């Protein structure tokens, strides 16, 4: 899904943690019982987002959303990783929203600026691919319609 990125911030998304590393993060959260430390939850969410498994990525985003809501001191970090996670799963609308919120508070944040540029490039690229597919489908449809009309004559 991700080629070599020109943005260092996105390169960290390309490498998943090993299942053993992810297990260590999960075990840490579970060992803390009913009320795990926010940092432990954040670390686990980060590991989940780096995963290549879509459901795990969504779980990581969900954990970060809860942390963002419940732990004001972690909002900055949560916003950034919510943007990264949303980007990774292809939810560019939310990725943009999170990056914009971060940039509203920190307009000079280079990582957030790079992420926003990358989101824009990805949306543009996927839009062009979509236009190409739609154009191809239209051409096929016109060709079939033309053939049918000639056949009726």
From Swiss-Prot:
Membrane topology reported for the UniProt record: Single-pass membrane protein
Stretches of the chain found on the membrane's Cytoplasmic side: 1-127
GO cellular component: mitochondrial outer membrane; peroxisomal membrane
Compartment list: Mitochondrion outer membrane
InterPro entries listed in its UniProt record: Fis1, Fis1_cytosol, Fis1_TPR_C, Fis1_TPR_N, TPR-like_helical_dom_sf
Gene3D superfamilies reported in the protein's UniProt record: Tetratricopeptide repeat domain
GO biological process: autophagy of mitochondrion; mitochondrial fission; peroxisome fission
Residue intervals annotated with topology Mitochondrial intermembrane: 149-153
Regions that span the bilayer: 128-148
Subcellular location, principal: mitochondrion
Keyword entries, A-Z: Membrane, Mitochondrion, Mitochondrion outer membrane, Repeat, TPR repeat, Transmembrane, Transmembrane helix
Superkingdom to which the source organism belongs: Eukaryota
Pfam families listed in its UniProt record: Fis1_TPR_C, Fis1_TPR_N
Residue ranges of TPR repeats: 76-109
Family: Belongs to the FIS1 family.
Function as written in the Swiss-Prot or TrEMBL entry: Has a role in mitochondrial fission. Has a role in outer membrane fission but not matrix separation.
Free-text note regarding domains: The C-terminus is required for mitochondrial localization, while the N-terminus is necessary for mitochondrial fission.
Protein name (database record): Mitochondrial fission 1 protein
Species this protein is from: Debaryomyces hansenii (strain ATCC 36239 / CBS 767 / BCRC 21394 / JCM 1990 / NBRC 0083 / IGC 2968) (Yeast)
């Amino acid at each position: 899904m991700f080629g070599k990125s020109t943005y260092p911030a996105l390169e960290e998304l390309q490498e998943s943690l090993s299942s053993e590393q992810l297990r260590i993060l999960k075990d840490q959260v579970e060992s803390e019982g009913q009320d795990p430390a926010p940092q432990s939850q954040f670390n686990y969410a980060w590991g989940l987002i780096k995963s290549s498994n879509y459901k795990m990525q969504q779980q990581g985003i969900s954990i970060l959303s809860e942390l963002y809501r419940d732990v004001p001191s972690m909002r900055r970090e949560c916003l950034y990783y919510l943007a990264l996670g949303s980007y990774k799963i292809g939810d560019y609308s939310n990725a943009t929203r999170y990056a914009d919120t971060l940039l509203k508070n920190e307009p000079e944040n280079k990582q957030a600026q790079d992420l926003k540029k990358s989101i824009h490039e990805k949306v543009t690229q996927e839009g062009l691919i979509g236009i190409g597919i739609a154009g191809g489908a239209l051409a096929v449809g016109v060709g079939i319609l033309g053939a049918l009309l000639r056949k009726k004559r």
